[in-house]
Amino acid sequence: MLTLKAVIFGAIGTISETSELQRQSFNAAFAEAQLDWHWTAQQYRSLLLTNGGQTRLHEFRDADPARHHVSDADIEKLHEAKTRLYVQLLTGAGAVKLEPRPGVAELVAQCLAENIKLAWCTSTSMENVGSIQTALNGQLPLDRFHTVVTIDKIKRVKPAPDAYVYALAQLGVNADEVVAIEDTPVSISAAKAAGVYCIATPGATTAGQDFSQADRVLADLTGLNTEQLRHLLMMHLTAPMTSHLTARKAKL
């Protein structure tokens, strides 16, 4: 019998809008390293087509010969500085407080009440996850998520399916028993590569990108409940069977 056993939240932006804070942290790291790099909001939107902060740094450097003097070791240090500055923004004096995206807290609460397992399937560090939990100030019970996937637990970042394969194993469920929620095309590719039904909720910095791989696109999770998720999953899983039966009847 088809059933919904788990909901997987993907990238950080599915939980809370943090991309602008991350952009500011990258720029602060560049300034700290005395680099004349500065990412505008428009540039960062384009960079988000690639997953993983270090990968973005590598791609940005490699795109212009004038930046090739920055070594791989320098990039690693830049990313470490960005993480430190980002964590300070969320946990230090005068820390920024985050809000869950619309509908997230309600859906999480309903899943917990119905014993539907929860996972957070990121490509970020555990340090970043911890700082986000602090900045959410108890608004989301992330400690009750069955598993949180971080960069140290996988070999390849999204769009590779590694994070989802790991999450499914930790949850003890099959891909066809899960709904994923993602906010970037590259992360959706990872979910689909793992065979997981995926709902896209584009964020402030990813709206307008190509979400055609998603099974469904929503502005946010407002009003979305577990009964609707079950229905969407069932319709998705039975669609090939229905199409096959219809085609067979037509032949007869």
What do these predicted regions represent?
Residues 16, 119-123, 181:
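Active-site-adjacent beta-strand anchor residues
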Residues 2-102, 109-114:
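N-terminal helical cap/lid subdomain that shapes the substrate entry/recognition surface
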Residues 26, 95, 104-134, 191:
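Substrate-recognition element of Asp-dependent hydrolases with the DxDx(T/V) motif
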Residues 73, 77, 95-102, 123, ...:
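Residues at secondary-structure transition points
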Residues 20, 38, 69-72, 98, ...:
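Non-catalytic, surface-exposed connector residues within folded enzymatic/regulatory domains
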Residues 59-65, 117-125, 148:
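N-terminal-biased segments
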Residues 2-4, 109, 125-127, 131-252:
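Asp-based, Mg2+/Mn2+-dependent phosphohydrolase catalytic module
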